[in-house]
């Protein structure tokens, strides 16, 4: 039974379909919640319309990119089309396009539910914190269940229909490339609006957040959806697919060597159980009448983790799977939780780092920036150690199994860490839903009590969002280490037909080709981040000029005349146009750099390139995500009445810190882990070409 991979494929498909049915039930539950406030309904439709318009335009641009990429893939991958059988190239192209479609669907599903749940959550807060929390959480869970169900279904179908792991890498590349551009575009949109709204509204005019007089306020709320919902959904979809693809590449290679299909079966078994555990975790998630939303979200994550550990242990025993592989996957899962806890410590407004940055803000914005940068760098150490220990422990646990099992252990550690991604996405999507709900409550005049409730929910969302971003980056770290193993596996398979080829087991950093690749690879995340943040910079300056124009030219707007409304659509247009203009160059730079390094230095240079890219990318991603979350929550801590409260000099300094942190945590930081995955997949897909056609090989 343990060698019957088709059994576990069938189970995976069944569990995927169950997750879709559960997502539909959750969607209908949210839709049934009462909503009667006319002002909230009107503003909610503006947000929904803006988000759908942006997504349509973004996907139109990305469809052109995907079409061009599909032509190149057909011509050159897995080998030039004129050299032999054309069928593998057709299969690879279809797999790539399927990956882009699944990834795009993840973003679209997220937008649809988030722009319904935000209105329902705002009005539910009139009944208390419990119903409002459940509405926001279940709205996020629709996306969690749909995205992970799509992942498992997509990988299962590609594996079953093609019986080819290279096609899985093509599917993963499709998901990753679209996720890279979607995350970059959404991040530029959301932070353009957020920075502009904060600088003009809070710093210059001293008006509250989400004040309807601010022309950028609707664009800001649209940005929460296109960046934090659609972008993060595509991002975690991509990480999950990549971890399974890397594990299956090595599993199939091992199965060929030892006979049977036990290792492939293990990957599908654990992935299906992870989704089942997330379904149970979401279904049982509750918060007491006067409970703490942060505690409720974290408790659901811990429950899901425990369910996965128990069920996989039972499956390993019952089906006679390898216990060492189970150990590797559990290590990955536990380290994921630890990375989340570390991110929580540095970003939670009840912990010392946030208080220290708030205290520093009393002395001015320079000290806000300095303290935030310092704590951001310190926060990288626990996560980097965690990723390193997870990889090392998984490697050593599986080493006695021999052959390629140590690297397979690392791949399964990544699968384990991402096993509860259904719950992680649910928690992550909850954040922007309740953030929108808070804005709608203020614009809909629901009163101070409702604002207090939505502030509490929003604070929990910010804390959990920092945790989920740390988790996503940690998972990407293990995934790309596994993809490095998959790259070596692909190179050795391609080299087997070349006379005199010596199989690769590792890379020597004293080899100048490896060192060349390492230096270039390490620089890419920094340049990539800079390009995205400069995009936000340029776009925000255009929007700030537009906001100034409206306050200057529209009579009664600044004074709050109830009969005067800003031209919200102008700011949405600026954010959309700028994001679409800026989203392609950074991603294209990363992909082209990989290809150039490969053709110049060969597979040795690519090995160094990936190593440098992984280390520097993880460090920067963790630093930016945690520093940005720290500045954001320090500002909110001051706004809650500490260190002088709203309007104080400390508050103005904290707003400056938050403005710097916004593109850190919501544009560049979360996009880096997708960039690392994309270049790793490009390397694996083009390994044959790099092996035979490099300049200095």
Model-predicted regions and their roles:
Residues 1-697:
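Hydrophobic packing and interface segments
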